[in-house]
A protein has these predicted regions:
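The conserved Walker
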Residues: 185
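Conserved pre-motif I regulatory segment
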Residues: 101-182, 191-265
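Conserved P-loop NTPase motor "coupling/switch" region that bridges the ATPase
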Residues: 405, 426-570
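Charged, low-complexity intrinsically disordered regions
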Residues: 1-126, 227-232, 238-267, 273, ...
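Surface-exposed beta-strand-to-loop junctions
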Residues: 17-19, 101-112, 172-179, 287-292, ...
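Catalytic P-loop NTPase motifs of RecA-like helicase/translocase cores
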Residues: 188, 413-417, 446-447
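Inter-lobe connector of SF1/SF2 helicase motors
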Residues: 123-129, 338-340, 355, 438, ...
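SF2 helicase/translocase NTPase motor core
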Residues: 204-408, 412-421, 493, 545-549
Length: 603
């Protein structure tokens, strides 16, 4: 700290901050009172160069360390605007280290995918390729809670204003191997997903790093070269089917090799849960054996199952598909499920897998007693026992497989879930082992949709075609759509009820952000938002992402919100789509429908 006086009444203090990641072994930083003082200090510091050198007066503007404090509220972009100005997908195959995945990306970008009957548009190729890139080579990103600041020497350091933490080197997280495919309705999201599944048809899921210890077997005696090679193929998930198929076309016979590979499927073990209470004679929980597979799970609403079946038949050839829609339809065994390329579930049938660990009466081991109090049969000493029995519980075959990916069509309903409000679907998702998770929805939340949709909606009373030049420039398009939102911030041009209009808009925007947070934490398991209190690095979505306009306890900044959205969502801007395909004129007209008796009664 340095102190300097300008005159008898004014002075300045130069403050030097010791980053939290320096001197951790000798400097204690556990006192909450000091952390609270640091938080207050960080909001008051003026980092302007003129202030640093002493060239300031009482009228000089303050340049806060937290730049968001210097921005006017009307300068803050809305969530709708951010969603519609996200950068269009730009996949880079060269960043993918895995040769098989990189070649699959090139195949997607060229629309040269084996088994794909349809030639994709350029924007569809880019979206599918970026999905594969995120699955195969998730990038490292700076913790979105941190803000980069440049010190007086021109060196960057990082600050978490809410936690009052300063770091010389930033914390980094691996981006989620999934996200939200949010292309506008009608742009072929189903085709994009099918192309991704076909392009990675032979790419298996991989053993998670945290469970990889001990996966290399120790044999009692040296195995044959064939068996050891087959075990290595299964353990590493190396693609082998097309390789042998090509050689067999030349007249070679690899039947014994293929049988050996099937004999040694890749697998790993998940340790049993740690008991909550210590006991003198603890009973160790048995580890769960999980097998690797190339299968993709697809969960869709019941009314879209037929559409997916038709799209699969129309666009693909050679996919081995299992459709699960009926409540009484029993799932095949795990080893049989692993042979499918695509397992299509209706949402209702998928939710039924939440009964794992329950008997037919909905009881589990943790909710029942071990003492039988059932009545006797007549005058005999034999009980009419209906007690819970572990052998009578349902065991979902899905728990025995590590799937390559999970795709949920119209999965925005997961935004209604939370850490405390659980549903059957979230229960199933929690016990599933999946390498990548995707939600497919053009409207991830109620207020998030394409600007072109909003413009079309505003013209719904007109039967004239949409002029093509109105959609040529995305900035003009967004300007037309968001004009009313921007006007709400011009307090002098609206009557007194503008406060109510703006508050209603912010309330709906807060709901949209909360739903996105639930999707990120509950479904996508995106770091750091999925961290729990037990992890010691809990990140509150409401604190870091929600903006001050959304509540008194929200201190999020726009950079954090923007980086979070860019890491989650894949969608094209309207002008980038129109460069690839010229759509016919859009005609809209209002058609009045006579309501049925049920419609009238519901009113």
């Amino acid at each position: 700290m340095e102190f300097k006086t300008n005159d008898q009444s004014l002075g300045q203090i130069r403050i030097y901050i010791l980053p939290d990641d320096i001197g951790r072994g000798v400097v204690a930083r556990t006192r909450n009172s000091l952390r609270k003082d640091m938080r207050k200090l960080l909001t008051e510091i003026d980092i302007a160069n003129s202030t640093w050198v002493g060239e300031w007066d009482e009228g000089s503007p303050v340049a806060h360390l937290d730049a968001s404090l210097d921005k006017k509220e009307e300068d803050q972009a809305s969530l709708f605007y951010l969603f519609n100005t996200l950068p269009s997908p730009s996949p880079i195959p060269e960043l993918v280290e895995n040769n098989v995945a990189r070649n699959a990306m090139y195949g997607l970008l060229d629309s040269a995918v084996a088994g794909l009957n349809t030639i994709m548009h350029q924007y569809q190729r880019r979206s599918a390729a970026l999905m594969l890139q995120r699955e195969s080579q998730p990038s490292q990103t700076v913790d979105p809670r941190l803000t980069a600041v440049i010190d007086k020497k021109g060196v960057a350091w990082y600050c978490d204003f809410d936690a009052a933490t300063c770091l010389r080197e930033p914390r980094q997280y691996e981006n989620s191997t999934g996200g939200i495919l949010a292309e506008t309705m009608g742009l072929g999201k189903t085709l994009i997903c099918l192309a991704l599944i076909l392009a990675t048809k032979e790419i298996s899921s991989q053993i998670p790093v945290e469970f990889s210890v001990g996966t290399i077997p120790v044999r009692e005696r040296t195995g044959s070269l064939k068996d050891m090679a087959a075990a290595a193929v299964g353990r590493t998930g190396a693609p082998w089917k097309s390789y042998f198929a090509t050689l067999e076309e030349e007249g070679y016979d690899y039947f014994r090799c293929k049988e050996a590979i099937k004999k040694y499927p890749g697998h790993y073990f998940i340790p049993g849960p740690v008991p909550r209470r210590q006991s003198r004679n603890p009973i160790p929980k048995q580890a769960r054996k999980v097998f690797l597979t190339t299968a993709t799970l697809v969960v869709v609403p019941s009314n879209l199952v037929k559409q997916w079946e038709l799209e699969i038949k129309k666009h693909t050839t050679g996919l081995k598909v299992l459709v699960m829609t009926k409540s009484k339809q029993i799932l095949p065994k795990a080893e049989d499920l692993a042979e499918y390329d695509l397992i299509l579930f209706s949402k209702q049938r998928f939710d039924m897998e939440a009964t794992d660990g329950l008997d037919k009466m909905g009881r589990s081991k943790s909710t029942t007693f071990n003492v039988c109090n059932c009545p006797y049969i007549g005058a005999t000493r034999e009980r009419d026992c209906t007690c819970f029995k572990v052998e009578d519980t349902y065991r979902s075959p899905l728990k025995q497989l590590h799937f390559k990916r999970l795709i949920t069509d119209e999965g925005h309903s997961f935004g209604n879930s939370s850490r405390t409000a659980r549903t059957e679907a979230t229960t199933v998702i929690d016990f599933l082992q999946v390498s990548a998770r995707w939600i497919v929805s053009g409207t991830p939340t109620k207020g998030l949709y394409g600007a072109e949709v909003a413009l079309g909606s505003s013209r719904s009373t007109s039967s004239t075609p949409l002029p093509s030049n109105e959609a040529d420039d995305n900035g003009q398009l967004l300007g037309k759509v968001t004009n009313s939102l921007a006007a709400l911030k011009r307090w002098d041009s609206y009557p007194a009820d503008v406060n109510q209009q703006e508050m209603a808009f912010y309330k709906e925007e807060r709901k949209d952000l909360e739903k996105l947070g639930n999707i990120a934490a509950i479904y996508l398991k995106a770091k750091p938002w999925s961290n729990s209190l037990e992890d010691g690095d809990y990140a509150s979505w409401s604190q870091y992402v929600l903006q001050p306009r959304h509540g008194s306890k929200s201190h999020g900044n726009m950079d954090c919100l923007r980086s979070t959205l860019e890491g989650m969502i894949i969608r094209h801007r309207p002008e980038d789509v129109e460069r690839d395909v010229i759509l016919p004129p859009l005609y809209q007209s209002v058609v009045n429908l006579e309501g049925s008796l049920q419609d009238k009664l519901s009113l």
